Amino acid sequence: MIEFIRGYVDYVCPEYIVIDHNGIGYEIFTPNPFAFQESREAAVTVYTYEYVREGVHALYGFPTREERNLFAKLLQVSGIGPKGGLAILAAGRPDELARAIEEENEAFLCKFPGVGKKTARQMILDLKGKLGALAAPAAARSAAPLSGALAEAVAALKALGYAEREIEKIIPALREEAMSTEQYVKRALALLLG
């Protein structure tokens, strides 16, 4: 099992990144490949999950061990495969997902791509009580790193010329619900301009 890979981002595309580690390029599928775009000059650590099944051998990577562990737990849920797990993690923050499972919030879980009522119920049945510190209280969440679509939206806002301090002021309002990158950008612009 490969715990993590530390190296330089060589290539970024919509589905995966390539990490150059000592001259070997590792193709790693991530929930949000473009979050690694800004790290092209510096060494990055990607925590990996090695997925081996009939005819499939793939690496899935995450910025934190916690997110990687949540991905592994999602794969244990009937009806969720690697692509579904990545889509769920790309659409929201791990702590919000864990809290929704602990609180049995089916409506929130159904907002994630590919998750209907049946899958949401299965997630609650299989994972409730098994996510530990991920379902942290609100005070701990405020300092949590951005992930998924929100990180992409923040990168887009920076590209549009907004200052980091302006963006930080609206992040708590953006974290209130899971949205796509486009929806986050629209909401952020409304908050910044309004």
From Swiss-Prot:
Can you say where in the cell this protein is located?
Answer: Cytoplasm
Spell out the coiled coil positions from the record: none
Region (Domain I) residue ranges read: 1-63
Any single GO molecular-function term of the entry would be: four-way junction helicase activity
Locate the region Domain II.
64-142
Q: Does the keyword DNA damage apply?
A: yes
> Main subcellular localization, coarse class?
cytoplasm
The record's GO CC annotations read: cytoplasm; Holliday junction helicase complex; Holliday junction resolvase complex
Q: Which intervals of the chain are annotated as region Domain III?
A: 147-194
Q: Which CDD domains match?
A: UBA_RuvA_C
Q: Which UniProt keywords apply?
A: Cytoplasm, DNA damage, DNA recombination, DNA repair, DNA-binding
Give the Pfam families listed for this entry.
HHH_5 (PF14520), RuvA_C (PF07499), RuvA_N (PF01330)
Protein's GO biological process: DNA recombination; DNA repair
Task: Name the family.
Answer: Belongs to the RuvA family.
Q: What is recorded about the domains?
A: Has three domains with a flexible linker between the domains II and III and assumes an 'L' shape. Domain III is highly mobile and contacts RuvB.
Q: How does this polypeptide assemble, per the annotation?
A: Homotetramer. Forms an RuvA(8)-RuvB(12)-Holliday junction (HJ) complex. HJ DNA is sandwiched between 2 RuvA tetramers; dsDNA enters through RuvA and exits via RuvB. An RuvB hexamer assembles on each DNA strand where it exits the tetramer. Each RuvB hexamer is contacted by two RuvA subunits (via domain III) on 2 adjacent RuvB subunits; this complex drives branch migration. In the full resolvosome a probable DNA-RuvA(4)-RuvB(12)-RuvC(2) complex forms which resolves the HJ.
Annotated function? The RuvA-RuvB-RuvC complex processes Holliday junction (HJ) DNA during genetic recombination and DNA repair, while the RuvA-RuvB complex plays an important role in the rescue of blocked DNA replication forks via replication fork reversal (RFR). RuvA specifically binds to HJ cruciform DNA, conferring on it an open structure. The RuvB hexamer acts as an ATP-dependent pump, pulling dsDNA into and through the RuvAB complex. HJ branch migration allows RuvC to scan DNA until it finds its consensus sequence, where it cleaves and resolves the cruciform DNA.
What is the name listed in the Swiss-Prot or TrEMBL entry for this protein?
Holliday junction branch migration complex subunit RuvA
Q: What does UniProt list as this organism's lineage?
A: Bacteria, Bacillati, Bacillota, Bacilli, Bacillales
- Gene symbol? ruvA
